[in-house]
């Protein structure tokens, strides 16, 4: 009986610590009604780089290793989304094509060859594909405080 009780407590603790939420939110919750038009954000990114915004986009992929990054498409742009202080993760698979609303700071960043290779490795690219990455890349990036994924 004592072992059953202990096992029950462990199951509850495990489920609580590993389920980030049940409403589609990951990280800090935020008001999705404050959503900004992406076109307006994009037009002002050069003037106000690294400012806080809430935008939406279609999820293209997420890190299949830990869920520690994802790529979204907003309008015609692809944005690399990372999570503040690695404080939360998104599902590693099954969210491609879903809509994400993200809250945080958008910027234009020069990604190093090492970082690009790391992301390619996480994404399961072949050794040959990884070795072809030889130049840094300027990219739209987003450091998210919180993410809302529809259909979860």
Q: Which residues does each predicted region cover?
A:
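Bacterial Sec-dependent N-terminal signal peptides
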Residues: 1-23
